[in-house]
Amino acid sequence: MQKLELLYEGKAKRIYRTESADMVWVEYKDSATAFNGEKKETITGKGRLNNEITTLLFRKLQEVGIKTHFVEKLSETEQLVKKVSIIPLEVVTRNVIAGSLSKRLGMEEGTVLAEPIVEFYFKDDDLGDPLVTEDHIRVLNVASPEQVSVLRDMALQINQVLIDHFASCRVRLVDFKLEFGVTDEGAIILADEISPDTCRLWDETSNEKFDKDVFRRDLGNLTDAYEEILKRLGGISHV
């Protein structure tokens, strides 16, 4: 499989065409961004870590029957994935009060929720990726009610798999963001990535943060935090 021309470049990844109409080549970048791109920095090794962690987690989900776009890891920073039409919604699942939810509800960060909350955010940089209701989604016409129901069900299924998997590594899954795509056959599958860029991950005992909040809040060395997650997941750490 060959990497051909650049199709799209986002904050964290570059997407390239391949000679297969059904596959695209993903390259993870060493860039870190926060606050809708207002804070930016190049962090050597971040792309490798997100690629390695996403590979491990997508393989775990595939093992239990969850359909994803992941095909294979091509290099330390690259993956081959199925080409899908991305649904322009970020699906956020929350198990513990943190981040914007703490501010929005006026509740203390770290409060454990009795059951998970699923939220939808409209993917639009100009609007700041706003929180939307299912009624808003219908008005925006970006997903049908049936698709929204599938997204919610898949997010909750993935949440339980990841909660258990991270717990075995002594990590608490606080919350995480997912993106989904539609195949040519009309099936909804998991796309994008699952990494410390898209999850809040805390040590189950100390609540030490191993995610992008380290960068957002200037809490320490980002690559050290991501290396710790990779090590606990059983990947090859470069520490």
UniProtKB/Swiss-Prot annotation:
Pathway: Purine metabolism; IMP biosynthesis via de novo pathway; 5-amino-1-(5-phospho-D-ribosyl)imidazole-4-carboxamide from 5-amino-1-(5-phospho-D-ribosyl)imidazole-4-carboxylate: step 1/2
EC number: 6.3.2.6
Entry keywords, A to Z: ATP-binding, Ligase, Nucleotide-binding, Purine biosynthesis
Catalytic activity: 5-amino-1-(5-phospho-D-ribosyl)imidazole-4-carboxylate + L-aspartate + ATP = (2S)-2-[5-amino-1-(5-phospho-beta-D-ribosyl)imidazole-4-carboxamido]succinate + ADP + phosphate + 2 H(+)
An annotated GO BP: 'de novo' IMP biosynthetic process
An example molecular function term from Gene Ontology annotations: phosphoribosylaminoimidazolesuccinocarboxamide synthase activity
Gene3D superfamilies given in the database record: ATP-grasp fold, B domain, Phosphorylase Kinase, domain 1
A Pfam family it matches: SAICAR_synt
InterPro entries: SAICAR_synt/ADE2_N, SAICAR_synt_PurC, SAICAR_synth, SAICAR_synthetase, SAICAR_synthetase_CS
PANTHER family to which the protein is assigned, alphabetical: MULTIFUNCTIONAL PROTEIN ADE2, SI:DKEY-6E2.2
Entry's family note: Belongs to the SAICAR synthetase family.
Name this protein carries in UniProt: Phosphoribosylaminoimidazole-succinocarboxamide synthase
Source species: Bacillus anthracis
Primary gene name: purC
